[in-house]
């Protein structure tokens, strides 16, 4: 995989003189840095420059390539070792009553779709359940996609939110509303 750990491992191996190849299922390298972190937080030019540094070191990156049989791939490629960097791109599951009653999507999928150019259809009012940094990103992106109201709903108090205060403040500056436990 060409996400953070795969790219980091490739760099460490390449600077030590090893020949390195990366295979990734996505269209472009970067993993969650490209598909989970909004561009306003991590400009794609910065990420692309880091990937270009790896290529300059001789790292071969092949995208749009899913590995179905790791052992066969290792044998066919005559690799001495394989580092499996499959990523951590899953959202936390929460039990929300009537979750199947309306259009609901997890924040990671929403952010990945936006980053991939697949603009999701959103309504004028968007509710985000949770108050972590990913929730703040999703709320801000919803506003940028045209939502009139983007509301963070959190089951605890503001003091208990896992997001960094500056992330909350940035979201509020963009018009995101916060609904805390009272």
Which residues does each PLM region occupy?
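Rossmann-like dinucleotide/flavin-binding elements
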Residues: 2-23, 62-74, 90-92, 108-165
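Extreme N-terminal leader/targeting segments of oxidoreductases
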Residues: 15, 48-52, 101-107
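Glycine-rich, phosphate-binding/catalytic loops in enzymes
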Residues: 16, 39, 99-102, 145
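Rossmann-like dinucleotide-binding cores of NAD(P)H-dependent redox enzymes
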Residues: 22, 26-57, 61, 114, ...
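Conserved N-terminal/central alpha/beta ligand/cofactor-binding core
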Residues: 33-34, 50-81, 99
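Short hydrophobic core segments
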Residues: 79-87, 127-129
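Conserved acidic residues
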Residues: 80, 102, 124
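Flavin (primarily FAD) binding-site architecture
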Residues: 85-100, 104-105
């Amino acid at each position: 995989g060409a996400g953070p750990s795969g790219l980091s491992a490739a760099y460490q191996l390449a600077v030590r003189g090893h020949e390195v190849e990366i295979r990734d299922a996505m269209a472009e390298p970067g993993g969650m840095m490209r598909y989970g972190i909004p561009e306003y937080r991590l400009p794609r030019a910065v990420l692309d420059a880091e990937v270009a540094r790896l290529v300059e070191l001789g790292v071969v990156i092949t995208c749009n390539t899913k590995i179905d049989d790791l052992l066969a791939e290792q044998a066919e490629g005559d690799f001495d070792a394989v580092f499996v960097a499959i990523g951590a791109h899953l959202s936390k599951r929460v039990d929300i009553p009537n979750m199947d009653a309306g259009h609901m999507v997890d924040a990671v999928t929403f952010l990945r779709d936006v980053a991939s150019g697949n603009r999701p259809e959103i309504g004028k009012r968007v509710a985000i359940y949770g108050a972590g940094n990913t929730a703040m990103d999703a709320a801000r992106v919803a506003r940028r996609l045209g939502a009139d109201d983007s509301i963070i709903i959190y089951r605890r108090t503001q003091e208990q939110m896992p997001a960094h205060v500056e992330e909350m403040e940035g979201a509020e500056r963009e018009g995101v509303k916060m609904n805390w436990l009272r």
